[in-house]
Amino acid sequence: ATWLGCKQVYTASFMQPSDIAELIQGEQVTYTAGVPTIWIGLLNFLEATEYDVSSLRRIPVGGAAAPSALIEKFAKQFGVEIIHAWGMTELSPIGTLCYLKSYMHDWPEEKRSAVRAKQGLASPNVELRAVDENGGEVPWDGSSPGELQVRGTSVISEYYRDERSADSFMDGWFCTGDVVTIDSEGYIQIVDR
């Protein structure tokens, strides 16, 4: 935001939905991020009040999966796109973003919603795969679970002077500990942590 000359609005800790709605309305916030529980609380608050959040365009969410109902209600009631993201500090921090591929925009809403419910596609310069307990790559069929492994220019190559490194990497891949499925389009869905 600073690089592009955009205004940044910072929040206090432990904000209530009313505080968030007031900031969005008062500061004309267009883009914000957070965990799903924040946006569930805000949605419930907005449905019962008259705050103007029409400036808001997008909300990337991470830390947990956002319920499909949350994604759909923000889109239908407020025109806000909720975007799943997945990452870790070890990835600086974004590993995936969920967006529709161009040809998917013509799909029926139910099918698009199913895609939006996933954690997304690999970010630029991040490769990903899922492996079984024997280290074999699982198929990208949307149903075979495996541990998510990543590598790339923004992914750490080792922990500095830390014995965790030996258990955290396999053949140059960082082992995340998250269990995912990967569909034929390359979208991941976290199924266990």
Task: Describe the predicted segments one by one.
Residues 1-30, 45:
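Conserved AMP-binding/adenylation subdomain of ANL enzymes
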Residues 3-6, 29-34, 43-114, 127, ...:
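Gly/Ser/Thr-rich phosphate-binding loop
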Residues 24, 32-35, 178, 186:
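Residue-level signal for inorganic ion chemistry
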Residues 37-39, 66, 155:
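Alpha-helix capping/helix-boundary segments
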Residues 113-122, 139, 169-172:
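Short Gly/Pro-enriched turn/cap motifs at secondary-structure boundaries
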Residues 140-141, 147-193:
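Conserved ATP-binding/catalytic segment of the ANL
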